[in-house]
Amino acid sequence: MNYFLSRVSILLLFAPIVLAAQQSDSVFMTGGKQVSLTPVVIRSGTNVPGFIKRVENDTTFYKAFKNLRVLKYTSLNDVRMFGKNGRVEASMNSKTRQWASHSCRVTNILEEHTTGDYYKDDGEFNYYTGELYASLFFSKDTVCGETNVLKDIKLSIQGKRGLDKHKEQLKMLFFNPGKDIPGIPLMGNKVMVFDPSHSDLYNFVIDIQEYKGRPCYLFSLKAKDDLSFFKKDDIVIDEMVTWFDYTTFEVLARNYKMSYNAGVYRFNVSMEVEIAKFGKYLYPKVIRYDGNWGVMLKGKERGLFTATIYDLAD
């Protein structure tokens, strides 16, 4: 009965949505941030400062990716690399199964098909995007000591150098956006979108919508269009849209765009992530990546990949 009443209350909150659309948003100032609230949010009585703090401190999105370290699952993998003419010049399609037990995991390739020069003659990756993808989702050899416990990023990159360090930094940037990433040249705190020094760079919006039939908060931030050249240089996360479960505040999905150019290190990336739940574990059900990036002496490459994860077991 309590669940029914709770559900009715949420539906009543959504009921006047047509009328709400005809009303203008209101602006709320908190922590130096200018946040636009839709009429439905105003009616809900949402504690805006508390909401922003929960968004800033959220760990459910990153936790979903960490949970892949301790779960068994099957993955459909689609990676495509594009040439300067915009055509696919190399690709990899595969089906893999990760086995995980007692803090150890290993990936078995069930099926794989490649085209073009996806691999070098010696079997190594010819593209950094392919190598990055493999480091995210594959473990060719058995790896032990795995955990889904969140830890300091400084510890996760400790002792890593070169491309291994860059891969770890990119993983943190992709899977924990908005938090400081140490060691990326000249980036500093530019990714810290909630830092007071970045408050005037973004438009923040809070809304209440449905995501695949579930009531949720929709939180979006987007770099302002009228920024000066030097202000634009302080932007790394261009746009981020996140759907939070209305009751649990767990992330249901996130879309984001990021770009950066420091000469030696540059990227322009869009990502879409759908989060699902297996028992007590959140996990990324679908991950879509489309972007180009490069590191000095490695050249520039554009790739697209999609990972679809299913058939989980603990």
Feature annotation, model-predicted:
Residues 1-28, 37:
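Bacterial Sec-dependent N-terminal signal peptides
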Residues 11-15, 46-52, 61-65, 137-138, ...:
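Generic marker of "main functional regions" within proteins
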